[in-house]
Amino acid sequence: MLTLLNRWRSQPGGASNAAAFIRVLESPKSAVTDKVLVLKAFNDWDVLVNTWFEVADALPAVEQLLDNNTFPEHSSAALLVSKVYFCLEQYERALEFALRGDFNVVPATRTGLGNDAEYVNKIIETAIDTYKTLSKQGSGIPQKLRDLIDRIVARNLDKREIWFVISLGFETTNLAMIDRAISAMPADLTIKNQTTLVETLNRVVNGAFDRSFRFQVIDTVIKTYLKCPSPDMSKICECYVLTDNAEAAADTITSLIAKSLSTRAYQIAFDLYETASQGFLDRVLKRFQQQDARDEKSMEKIHSILKGHETVKAYLDFFVRHNHTDSVLMEEIKENIRTASAHNALLISNGLMQYGTTCDDFLRNNLNWVSKATNWNKFNAVASLGLIHHGQESSAMKVLEPYLPKESVEGFGFKEGGAMLAYGLIHAKHGDATAMSTLAQWLKTAENEPVRHGACLGFGVAGLGSSSVSNYEKVREVLQRDEAVSGESAGIAMGLIMAGHLNQEVFNELKQYTVDTQHDKTQRGIRTGLACAAFGLQGDAEPYIKEAIGAKSNPMLRSTGICMLSMAYAGTGSPDVVRRLLEKVATDPNLDVKRYATIGIGFVLSKDPSTCLSYVAMLTEHFNGHVRYGAAMALGIACAGTGNMEAIALIEPMISDKEGFVRKGALLSLALIMCQQTDYTCPKVNGFRKQLLKKIGEKNEDSLVKFGAIIAQGLLDIGGQNAAVTMQNSDKQPDMGSMVGMMCFLHGWFWHSMHFFIALAAKPSCLVMMNENLKIPVLDYICHANSQKFAYPPRAESKKDKDVKKIETVVLSITGKKNASKKLIAEEKKRREAAASASSAAAAPSSSSTSGTAPAAEDEKMEVDQPGKSKKEKAPEKDTKPLHRLQNPARVIPAQRQLISISDARAYSPMKPLYKGGIIVADRVDKEREEKLVSEVVTQVNTPASSGNTENKPHSTFEININDF
């Protein structure tokens, strides 16, 4: 048999016509040794390439040999079957028989690929794909497949291909594999390995993974990262925030202080305040109390930073100095207002525009107009002061004193309730013990619903994320009164306090109250509150979400479950969650469920606008108006502050939608997307601004649309045109304040006062550099771009300027004769001066022409402008310089950050890259050079009317007493 096989293989043209040898395999009378020889011959690729289609017909016979326990060459038979299936391109079957062959398959080299190498690599590829699929399905993985994957992993680790193993671990959510790969890194950690750790961290943070899996991977990364000779402690503390390990973060700061690295410790403290919740920061401060402070001076600064004093002061300085609110625009909108709803909208919009600026000129200059506010409009008028004076905590009581309750509440308490909400907004996300105690006392002594309503909302926004059980219980007492209006605010406030800390007890309590109460306002408030409490919990919130969504006969609970699902997975980009939301859009009959499910896609994909566009594009043309509204808002959330042109193109047609609430949603969404955009970054923005004014001024437009247009104008210019609405913090992670603020803003569908909460999502577009003493030094930044690309939008023209009629100048006949005569005289004088002195001739003509002819012409002309000449004279010169300078603290919008550098890099060494923005602490490089500091923040203010570099006195406190409301 062996001789025949050799002759057959060596014949001219290679082996062919294998029928005779195939009969050997099929015949039960053939000797076993002959069958073994034939199998080995066919396993040679030189033979199989020409005969595999013939062998394919005999596969049943070969498979019978595999089932025969007495056959000695199972591996040869299995290998042959596997190769034939490979030729048939049935790769899963090829893998199955390769594994049954019980032989070691390892990847072949990439050089000189032959048939065998192609086969082996395809089997490996199929094995990995199968392993991934089974892992995601949670199905059992065959032991032989596990063994093969283990061999692949071991081989890659031996070759130091660590990232391949980590990627495979992420795709299969195999923590042991990731741990094995990271542990295999050398103790001295090269730059490449440190980069791998950073990539691992970015992958686990930005990926759609289970919370427990994420925490375990981050813990592994931290342990390995600490082995570095000089680890990035800022990155490590970022990990501690993600894993909610406040004690470790405190220990890190303490160790840096002990090593005399106080500047770096200050930077970490600033970053913690920006990204961590109040509850986390409280635990950090408690940890400090348990430690012995060696450097008390530095620790005092750390305490001040973590309590928010330094950040609030720096941002207040920035907003006041750079306030660029367009007062003319506000007056123009006011002139077009004819209804109470539009009046209410402008009060809210003014608060947003002047957020943090302490500039209440519009209210003080229009007291008669403001006094027209009644009932809840009066509530909002006073509450807007909380936005205007946000951060002015030291003088909060002085600002609000005229409106706070005295011995007895005047009227129905709308003014007092608004003042309490304003007090909470001034302390938003920063409710210290004094502020919370004050609000708690007001909450306890409140005598009517508007006062309790304002006290609850103020209490909740000041204590956002504190997870204080005692504060939660104080608000619960209001909920148990079973009042509609105060019950709504109590439900929201309970969720704000427990934001990110939902537990079984809280869920059961609020769910049961939703079922028991007859007030739909209270039910809606609890829905928003539970959604806020579920923020960021991901898999930990699944039991509560499934229980709520599973309430088949209760649409309020189902919509609550949808909101919780959106917030629990906000920013994760989980495709499974998006599919669940889309399923509810398609199948649930309730309109609230459909609307919130569509909006939820924007929350989940808030870090991935392009993916959100692909999911939501078709929904913008859905037959159901609530779905269209939800699609618009989803795009606004996911693309907030980006100026995304694709999103704008999808939303623009909805401005003319037949449904008024869809048109309103489209305007709000576009305002979110175009916030802080310029013609350079988004060519549509100026046209949209004109469209808003047109909507506000149209007499036949729906009042709901006008309300939305006015609020949209406030969003466009939020923070004096110095802030942007964004869903991420400085570390590009989902921001609790932003997500919670947006969820509360969406509650504005039912209750107008909730529009104030969008300010929680407004982040200052600033770059503030501080020295080691936490003072702001005088220094310049260089922006490597034309100054007009990132400039403020042009101011609106006043009505007086628009109404001026420009008439062509009338030139009398005698004037023409005089001008001609004067022209001849001037030319003669010019020739004489040129002959006398060449140098003076260069200057004399222009002097004579301007001083000799122009005044005479003006005397004879009528005092009006020439349209053509006026435009030429008044047109500003365009700045064509390729770069420009900015002064610290500077306004730097997100699109501008990558283009910023310090003018004198030898002066300061920042603790983090400038493109991160926000507050950056820097070490002085040249300490012998004299350091100049920026003047005190509150004492000098640039008003919108100021010109040049002169600085005016600060605005006087808005202390009118609106007793005639």
From Swiss-Prot:
Pfam families: PC_rep, RPN2_C, RPN2_N. One of its GO terms (cellular component) is proteasome regulatory particle, base subcomplex. Residues 863-882 have a biased composition (Basic and acidic residues). Keywords: Proteasome, Repeat. Residues 836-856 have a biased composition (Low complexity). InterPro entries: 26S_Psome_Rpn2 (IPR016642), ARM-like (IPR011989), ARM-type_fold (IPR016024), Proteasome/cyclosome_rpt (IPR002015), PSMD1_RPN2_N (IPR048570), RPN2_C (IPR040623). GO terms for biological process: proteasome-mediated ubiquitin-dependent protein catabolic process; regulation of protein catabolic process. Residues 836-889, 943-965 are annotated as: Disordered. One of its GO terms (molecular function) is protein kinase C binding. PC repeats lie at residues 380-413, 418-452, 454-488, 489-523, 560-595, 630-664, 665-706, 708-738. The keyword Acetylation does not apply. Acts as a regulatory subunit of the 26 proteasome which is involved in the ATP-dependent degradation of ubiquitinated proteins. Belongs to the proteasome subunit S1 family. This is 26S proteasome non-ATPase regulatory subunit 1. It comes from Caenorhabditis elegans.
